[in-house]
C-alpha cells in the first residue's frame, strides 16, 4: 500500500481507491494503515508531497504554481498553507532562505546518501520482483556451509525422543459419525494415536439425555450409543481423555461410572483419563469442594483412576500463576495446558522482541511451567493438549503462509518437555472458521476438509520417521544414526509478522542456500530425499488452483489428496569417503535425507567406529 502511494502521490489519490484495489473496506484499511505506519493516510500523503515540493524548491527554478500542480496539491494556496504549517515559512521564503542550494552542483548518483524512512524502505523491499512462474526464489541469505565427520561422534549421544500423539474431537457424539471414525482409523495407520481427547465436558453431551441410564427404556436409550463409542475406542487400543470442571455434577458422574463399571472390563476403565478444569473465577473453597468430590467418586468406582488439572496459563510469567499455590496440584496425577504463540504477540503493534520470542514460544512456556513445578518439588507429567506457532487470524495468513520448518522446530523442542501433545482431527471439528470471518488459531488441525492433510500432518509424518542417536544438531541441521543408517534433516526456519509479510515479494527473500558435506561415508548407499515446502506438499496452494465458485468436486479432492504430500526422490550413490549436497531451501522448507547402506560381498559401507 505504501508503494502504491509513493507511485501515485503526484495525482489526485484517495484511500477509497486503494481500498477498492485491495478488495477491503475503507474503514478497515484506514485503521490498519495507522497501526502499521503510525500516521493516517492523509497525513502520510501530505508529508510525502511536501517533502518532494521542498526538494523541488531547492533544486529547480520552477514556480510554486507548477510545483503544486506536479506534486498533486489541489491548489497553490493549499500547498502554501500546508508548507507554512510544517516549515513556518511560505514556499517563496523557504527558497530565499536557502539560496546556495540552487547553485550547488548535484553530486553523482552513486554518491548521494540520505536517511530513508522505515515505511519507505519497507515499501521498496516489498515491491514484487518481475519473475516468471517457474523462477526459483531469490536467495539473499549467505550460504550455510556444514562439514561433519561421522567418525567424530559424541561420547554419550542423546537419543531423539518422541512424545505421544493425542487427537481431539469436539464432542463425545462425534465418535458416532462414520466419517470421523474412518478418518481416525486412517490416521492411526499412518501416525500412531495414543488417545482421543473429547474437548467439551463429556457429561454435557446430548447422549446424556433423559433416560440414558433407565433400564426400563428400550436399549437403555442413549446408553447403547455410549457403550458403542467406548467399546470401539477400547478395540482401537486408545486411551480416552474426558473433561470435567467446577460445575460438573458429581451425582451424574457417579451414575455414569456405576453403569460403566457394570458394562466394561477393567482394562477399558483403566484407559480413561479425567481432566478437571481449574477455574480462576471460582473461590478456593468452591474449587476444593468440587475437586475432592469428583476425586472421591473416581477412586471409589474405578480400579486405577487418573485425574489431572487443566489450566490456561497467562501468556507472560506463567510460573507465578495462583494455581501453583493451590494444594490441589499436589493431589493431581498430571498437569494439562495449552501454548499458543499468537497470544504472545499483538499483531497490531510491531514489537521485534516479542516477534523473536514467539519463534519458540510453546517451548519457553513449557520450561517456565516445569521450573515452577520443580520449585515446589512437584514431579507431574505435562500434557500439552493444544498449541500453535505464530500465524495470523485470517485465511490468507493462517493458510497460505507455509510454516513447515517452524512447526518442526517447535515439535522437536516440546517433545522433550511433555508427556503427550494434542492436535485436532480436522478444521471442521476444531471450529477454525469463526462467524466474524476470523480464524481460531489457538490450536493445530491435522486435516482440512475431506481428510486433506494440512502441513502439520506431514511435519508429524517426517518427525515420526526420525530415530536414533543425535550426532549433530543446530538450528538448521539434525543428524541421526540408527543401526548403520543415517538421517539428515535440514530446515530453513523463518518467523515473521504475518501482517507485514507479502507472500509474492517478501517471503521469497528468505530462501536459504546451503552446502552440507558428510565425511566418512564409503561404499554404496541409497539416498532418499523427502522435500516439504510451499510447492511440494503444501495444501492451500493446491486448493487455490481450483477457481470455480462451486469448489472442488470428488475427483478434485482425490487429486488434492494425491498431490498434497512431500516430494520424494531416490538415488543410488557409490561414495568415496564423503557425501556432498549443495542446494537451497525456501522459507520454512524441510528436507529429510535418509541414508541406507547397500551391502556388497566383502564390503562394509558403514564408517569405521571410534577407537
Summary of predicted features, one role per range:
Residues 4-6, 11-48, 68-90:
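Basic/polar phosphate-binding segments, predominantly the helix-turn-helix DNA-binding elements
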Residues 9-10, 57-59:
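Short amphipathic helical patch at the helix-1/turn junction of helix-turn-helix
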Residues 81, 93, 97-273, 282-311, ...:
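Non-catalytic accessory regions flanking glycosidase/transglycosidase catalytic cores in CAZymes
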Residues 208-218, 346-357, 394-401, 436, ...:
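Short, flexible/disordered intra-domain loops and linkers
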Residues 272, 283-417, 421:
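Noncatalytic carbohydrate-binding groove/subsite architecture in carbohydrate-active enzymes
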Residues 379, 388-475, 480-481:
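C-terminal active-site-proximal or functional interface alpha/beta core segments in diverse enzymes
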Amino acid at each position: 500500500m505504501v508503494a502504491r502511494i509513493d507511485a501515485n502521490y503526484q495525482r489526485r489519490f484517495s484511500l477509497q481507491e486503494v481500498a477498492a484495489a485491495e478488495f477491503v473496506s475503507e474503514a478497515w484499511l484506514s485503521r490498519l494503515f495507522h497501526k502499521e505506519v503510525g500516521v493516517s493516510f492523509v497525513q502520510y500523503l501530505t508529508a510525502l508531497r511536501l517533502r518532494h515540493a521542498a526538494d523541488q524548491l531547492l533544486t529547480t527554478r520552477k514556480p510554486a504554481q507548477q510545483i503544486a500542480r506536479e506534486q498533486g496539491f489541489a491548489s497553490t494556496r493549499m500547498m502554501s498553507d500546508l508548507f507554512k504549517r510544517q516549515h513556518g515559512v511560505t514556499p517563496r521564503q523557504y527558497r530565499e532562505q536557502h539560496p546556495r542550494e540552487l547553485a550547488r552542483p548535484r553530486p553523482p548518483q552513486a554518491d548521494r546518501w540520505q536517511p530513508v524512512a522505515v515505511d519507505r524502505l519497507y515499501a521498496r523491499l516489498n515491491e514484487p520482483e518481475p519473475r516468471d512462474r517457474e523462477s526459483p526464489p531469490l536467495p539473499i541469505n549467505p550460504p550455510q556451509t556444514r562439514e561433519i565427520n561421522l567418525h567424530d561422534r559424541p561420547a554419550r549421544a542423546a537419543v531423539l525422543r518422541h512424545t505421544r500423539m493425542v487427537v481431539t474431537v469436539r464432542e463425545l457424539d462425534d465418535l458416532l459419525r462414520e466419517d470421523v471414525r474412518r478418518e481416525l482409523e486412517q490416521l492411526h495407520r499412518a501416525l500412531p494415536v495414543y488417545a482421543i481427547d473429547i474437548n467439551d465436558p463429556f457429561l454435557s453431551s446430548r447422549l446424556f439425555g433423559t433416560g440414558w441410564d433407565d433400564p426400563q427404556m428400550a436399549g437403555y436409550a442413549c446408553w447403547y450409543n455410549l457403550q458403542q463409542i467406548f467399546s470401539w475406542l477400547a478395540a482401537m487400543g486408545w486411551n480416552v481423555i474426558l473433561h470435567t470442571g467446577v460445575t460438573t455434577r458429581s451425582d451424574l458422574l457417579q451414575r455414569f461410572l456405576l453403569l460403566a463399571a457394570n458394562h466394561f472390563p477393567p482394562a477399558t476403565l483403566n484407559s480413561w483419563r479425567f481432566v478437571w478444569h481449574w477455574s480462576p473465577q471460582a473461590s478456593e473453597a468452591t474449587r476444593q469442594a468440587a475437586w475432592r468430590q469428583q476425586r472421591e467418586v473416581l477412586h471409589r468406582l474405578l480400579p486405577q483412576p487418573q485425574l489431572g488439572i487443566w489450566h490456561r496459563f497467562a501468556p507472560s510469567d506463567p510460573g507465578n500463576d495462583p494455581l501453583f499455590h493451590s494444594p490441589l496440584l499436589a493431589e493431581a496425577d498430571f498437569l494439562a495446558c495449552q501454548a499458543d504463540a499468537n497470544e504472545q504477540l499483538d499483531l497490531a503493534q510491531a514489537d521485534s522482541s516479542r516477534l523473536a520470542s514467539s519463534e519458540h514460544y510453546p517451548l519457553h512456556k513449557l520450561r517456565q511451567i516445569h521450573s515452577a513445578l520443580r520449585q515446589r518439588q512437584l514431579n507431574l507429567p505435562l500434557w500439552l493438549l493444544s498449541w500453535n506457532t505464530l500465524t495470523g487470524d485470517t485465511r490468507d495468513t493462517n493458510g497460505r503462509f507455509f510454516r513447515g520448518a517452524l512447526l518442526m522446530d517447535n515439535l522437536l523442542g516440546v517433545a522433550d518437555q511433555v508427556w503427550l501433545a494434542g492436535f485436532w482431527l480436522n478444521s471442521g471439528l476444531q471450529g477454525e472458521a469463526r462467524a466474524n470471518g476470523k480464524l481460531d488459531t489457538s490450536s493445530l488441525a491435522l486435516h482440512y476438509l475431506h481428510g486433506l492433510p494440512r502441513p502439520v500432518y506431514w511435519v508429524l509424518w517426517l518427525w515420526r520417521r526420525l530415530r536414533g542417536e543425535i550426532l549433530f544438531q543446530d538450528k538448521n541441521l539434525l543428524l541421526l544414526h540408527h543401526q548403520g543408517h543415517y538421517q539428515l534433516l535440514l530446515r530453513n526456519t523463518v518467523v515473521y509478522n504475518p501482517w507485514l509479510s507479502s507472500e509474492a515479494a517478501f517471503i521469497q527473500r528468505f530462501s536459504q542456500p546451503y552446502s552440507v558435506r558428510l565425511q566418512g561415508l564409503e561404499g554404496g548407499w541409497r539416498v532418499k530425499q523427502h522435500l516439504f515446502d510451499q510447492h511440494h506438499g503444501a495444501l492451500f496452494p493446491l486448493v487455490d488452483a481450483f477457481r470455480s465458485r462451486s469448489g472442488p468436486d470428488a475427483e478434485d479432492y482425490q487429486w488434492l489428496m494425491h498431490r498434497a504430500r512431500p516430494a520424494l526422490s531416490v538415488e543410488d550413490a557409490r561414495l568415496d569417503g564423503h557425501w556432498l549436497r549443495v542446494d537451497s531451501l525456501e522459507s520454512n522448507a524441510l528436507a529429510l535425507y535418509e541414508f541406507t547402506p547397500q551391502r556388497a560381498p566383502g564390503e562394509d559401507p558403514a564408517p569405521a567406529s571410534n577407537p
